[in-house]
Every structure is written in structure tokens, then in C-alpha cells.
Amino acid sequence: MLKTIKKIIKLQIKGGLANPAPPIGPALGSAGVNIMDFCKQYNFSTQKSKGKLLPVIITIYNDKSFSFIIKEPPVSKQLLELCKLDKGSKESNKIKVGKITLAKIESIAKNKIIDMNCFNIKSAISMVAGTARSMGIEIL
């Protein structure tokens, strides 16, 4: 029998740290999903990325079963992590808060290209570089 999709939920959850508290509990509880079952499966799947903020797309079916897809961390979070910053610049065109090399931007683009809306590495690098510039990070 073919399962029909009841709801699709997009969340950002820290890897290995899912628990029934908000935002996970209310989002899944309203759809009738076993919250603890999701948390156990998610935490098991994200053991290697413990503590990193990971986007997840949860598909809930009519029989209250679910599946989920874990994506790469957001580009902005990866840039902040590599530059060892807490947040980006308030005025990115005037105040520069960090520096990053083109090689590091390329490595982020290679990891994130599967989640991006582009077809080649050159455009992915351009997107990551644009994000860095808008955060006030200087590209070397």
C-alpha cells in the first residue's frame, strides 16, 4: 500500500541533542508522531555531528509513520565556525569581522552543493562567497 504524505516539517536541530521539548515536541505532537521514537532515531543518525545545528526535513505520513532527511549545516554557521566568530557584522560593507581564504570557501561549497540550488561548483563557490561578504567576512 502506498503511503500518503500528511505533513512536511522543516526544523533545525542540534545533532545528537534532539529532545521532546519545543520546537520538536509541538511540531511532531500536532501531527500525531511518536516524539521519543523520532528523537532516538535522529540522535542515532547524528552522533558524528553532535552539537552542530543541522536542518532536517521530516515527512509525516497518514499512518503516523515518518521519515527524515538530514542536510548539511547552514553556510552561515559553517563560516562562523571556520572564522571562530559568534556572529556576523552589523554593517557588512563597512565593518569586517573576520577573514577566510578562497580554499576554505571552496571546501564549504563542495560539502554544501548537494543542498544548494546550483549545478556546478563555480556557482556554489559564488553563493558561499556572497554569504561571507554579507556577513562581513573578508575573502583572501
UniProtKB/Swiss-Prot annotation:
Entry comment on modification after translation: One or more lysine residues are methylated.
Transmembrane segments: none
Superkingdom, natural source: Bacteria
Span of the signal peptide: none
Cellular-component GO terms for this entry: cytosolic large ribosomal subunit
Keywords, in A-Z order: Methylation, Ribonucleoprotein, Ribosomal protein, RNA-binding, rRNA-binding
Function recorded in the entry: Forms part of the ribosomal stalk which helps the ribosome interact with GTP-bound translation factors.
Family that this chain belongs to: Belongs to the universal ribosomal protein uL11 family.
HAMAP family found in the cross-reference section: Ribosomal_uL11
Alphabetized NCBIfam families for the sequence: L11_bact
Subunit composition and interactions: Part of the ribosomal stalk of the 50S ribosomal subunit. Interacts with L10 and the large rRNA to form the base of the stalk. L10 forms an elongated spine to which L12 dimers bind in a sequential fashion forming a multimeric L10(L12)X complex.
Protein name: Large ribosomal subunit protein uL11
Originating species: Karelsulcia muelleri (strain GWSS)
